[in-house]
């Protein structure tokens, strides 16, 4: 860490201790790539408020920051996997997921489950390397952390919190089929009006869509497993020295910070310890680099289109690139395209290629007219924040579902990346740019996002600090966590009541038979 950052950190810590004395120590178990963007935003704010933040990373981690000047501390745990091997593994998983046919539900999610298990095996290995490292665990124990902040999509943070005997807070976007939320968090998702995540339904479902939604829910609840829970349950039981399960350990989370909000998500019930903090990474646009600003200003009244398929897509076939470039060349707007590859033959004079774009700053520019996006949650939230209509080109994971949400809210047109033609893309761009319907809906979502009593980032930081101050948030924990599945669904009560009713019916029936028998006996005696 440079002298500049060291001095800044010391000043922050000193000011904290001299003022409120409420500075805490936060241990972080993060997830890579776009997940890191969200959690790092929270960590930077915690540091600004004087807290000491330590990020626990495995040696092949490609988190932005460990080798760069930062006020964050990084505790690196050595593993046998190299950084290149880890990055290649993740890249291959992304490519496999992108190549899975999306038109058939069952085969699609069987392959998704296989890939999730592969990823889970890798995370479990990292977790085992951490908890079995006696030197590291002793250091963590002696550091006396106040809270663990973990991304629930990569298990282990809750295990560390259990071993260190400290509370933990989750950050989560979603899990396939809401598995973590339902089984680890006790969340409620009534299938009659809450579409199963990744089903691409809206909350306004037809009868047949509700039938499919129910089937999907049953499939995710009883068949699909995002993680090989038997392996995780066995691993956690061995480490803790007592029988337990992954979801039982997850259920001890004090607060769930869900990276979503009602501008994006469809309404559904929430538990008291769940906070929606979607878009916490969004911020006002900063000035563009001089050369880029000049290109944007040269667009005149037509404005510009921003095109990015995210950081996970590093290459594109020559055929697809030419199809896209051909469509972009035919619009009057200037185009800024994030593209890392050979220059397409059909590239127009109105299009500039960049290996990296200041996406948030471009979306916040007054001359931006539309955003072509893969549908990643971070990108969509930046578009919502700035009120920009979208053309969605989803590739994998939650992107199809995210784009479906934006379609339901009238803020985007979607295309299939593998089958769209140049004409399709051109028509979609003209639609979202020229039809005021899309801009109006995008601005409406932006207005909803900005009209919150507390900003998402401040809300997230508040609850982390709350857990540190109060050593947890047990008063928000619903009693459902202490019930068995049959108690939760009142099956024992229903069984008892049915038994009571059956007993009463039996007694009444028996009495009637006795009375009838008595009456018959009496009549027979009189005849004799």
From Swiss-Prot:
Sequence positions bearing N6-succinyllysine: 135
Residues with attached carbohydrate: 315
Any matching Pfam family: UDPGT
Keywords: Endoplasmic reticulum, Glycoprotein, Glycosyltransferase, Membrane, Microsome, Signal, Transferase, Transmembrane, Transmembrane helix
SUPFAM superfamilies in the record: UDP-Glycosyltransferase/glycogen phosphorylase
CDD domains registered for this protein in UniProt: GT1_Gtf-like (cd03784)
Record's signal peptide: 1-23
InterPro entries named among the record's database cross-references: UDP-glycosyltransferase, UDP_glucos_trans, UDP_glycos_trans_CS
TM helices/strands, residue ranges: 493-513
Gene Ontology, cellular component aspect: endoplasmic reticulum membrane
Compartments it resides in: Microsome membrane; Endoplasmic reticulum membrane
Tissues/organs with expression: Expressed in several tissues, including prostate, testis, mammary gland, kidney, adrenals and intestine.
Catalytic activity, EC: 2.4.1.17
Bilayer topology annotation: Single-pass membrane protein
Gene Ontology molecular function, alphabetical: glucuronosyltransferase activity
Catalysed reactions, as listed in the record: glucuronate acceptor + UDP-alpha-D-glucuronate = acceptor beta-D-glucuronoside + UDP + H(+)
Taxonomic superkingdom: Eukaryota
Entry function: UDPGTs are of major importance in the conjugation and subsequent elimination of potentially toxic xenobiotics and endogenous compounds. This isozyme has glucuronidating capacity on testosterone, dihydrotestosterone, 5-alpha-androstane-3-alpha,17-beta-diol, androsterone, oestradiol, tetrahydroaldosterone and tetrahydrocortisone. This enzyme is essential to inactivation of several steroids.
PANTHER family to which the protein is assigned, alphabetical: EG:EG0003.4 PROTEIN-RELATED (PTHR48043), UDP-GLUCURONOSYLTRANSFERASE 2B4 (PTHR48043:SF12)
The family this protein is said to belong to: Belongs to the UDP-glycosyltransferase family.
Protein name: UDP-glucuronosyltransferase 2B30
GN (gene name): UGT2B30
């Amino acid at each position: 860490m440079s002298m500049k950052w060291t001095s800044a950190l010391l000043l922050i810590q000193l000011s904290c201790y001299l003022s409120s004395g409420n500075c805490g120590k936060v241990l972080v178990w993060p997830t890579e790539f776009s997940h890191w963007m969200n959690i790092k935003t929270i960590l930077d704010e915690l540091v600004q408020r004087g807290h000491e933040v330590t990020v626990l990373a495995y040696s092949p981690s490609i988190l932005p920051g460990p080798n760069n000047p930062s006020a964050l501390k990084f505790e690196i745990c050595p593993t046998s996997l190299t950084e290149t091997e880890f990055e290649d593994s993740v890249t291959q998983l992304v490519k496999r997921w992108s190549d899975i046919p999306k038109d058939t539900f069952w085969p699609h999610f069987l392959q998704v489950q296989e890939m999730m298990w592969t990823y889970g095996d890798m995370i479990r290995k990292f977790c085992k390397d951490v908890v079995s490292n006696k030197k590291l665990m002793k250091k963590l124990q002696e550091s006396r952390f106040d809270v663990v902040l973990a991304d629930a999509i990569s298990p282990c943070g809750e295990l560390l919190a259990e071993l260190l005997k400290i509370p933990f807070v989750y950050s989560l976007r979603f899990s396939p089929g809401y598995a973590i939320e339902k089984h680890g968090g006790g969340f409620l998702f009534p299938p009659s009006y809450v579409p199963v995540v990744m089903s691409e339904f809206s909350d306004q479902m037809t009868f047949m869509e509700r039938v499919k939604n129910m089937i999907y829910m049953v499939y995710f609840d009883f068949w699909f497993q995002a993680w090989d829970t038997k392996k995780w349950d066995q691993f956690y039981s061995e480490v803790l020295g007592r029988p337990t399960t992954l979801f039982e350990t997850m259920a001890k989370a004090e607060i769930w910070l869900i990276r979503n909000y009602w501008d994006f998500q469809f309404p559904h019930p929430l538990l008291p310890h769940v906070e929606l903090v979607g878009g916490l990474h969004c911020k006002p646009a900063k000035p563009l680099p001089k050369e880029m600003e000049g290109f944007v200003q040269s667009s005149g009244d037509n404005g510009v289109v921003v095109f990015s398929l995210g950081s996970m897509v590093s290459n594109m076939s020559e055929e697809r690139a030419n199809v896209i470039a051909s469509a972009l060349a035919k619009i009057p707007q200037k185009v800024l395209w994030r593209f890392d590859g050979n220059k397409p033959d059909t590239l127009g004079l109105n299009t500039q290629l960049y290996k990296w774009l200041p996406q948030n700053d471009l979306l916040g520019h007054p001359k931006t007219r539309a955003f072509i996006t893969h549908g990643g949650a971070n990108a969509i939230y930046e578009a919502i924040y700035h009120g920009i209509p979208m053309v969605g080109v989803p590739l994998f994971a939650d992107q199809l579902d995210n784009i479906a949400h934006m379609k339901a809210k009238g803020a985007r047109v979607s295309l299939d990346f593998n089958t769209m033609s140049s004409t399709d893309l051109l028509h979609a761009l003209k639609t979202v740019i020229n039809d005021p319907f899309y801009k109006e809906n995008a601005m409406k979502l932006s207005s909803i996002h900005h009209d919150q009593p507390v900003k998402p980032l401040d809300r997230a930081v508040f609850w982390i600090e709350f857990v540190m101050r109060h050593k947890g948030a047990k008063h928000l924990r619903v009693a459902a966590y202490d019930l068995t599945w049959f108690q939760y669904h009142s099956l024992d009560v229903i069984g008892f009541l049915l038994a009571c009713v059956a007993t009463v019916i039996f007694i009444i029936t028996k009495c009637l038979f006795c009375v009838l028998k008595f009456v018959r006996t009496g009549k027979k005696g009189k005849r004799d």
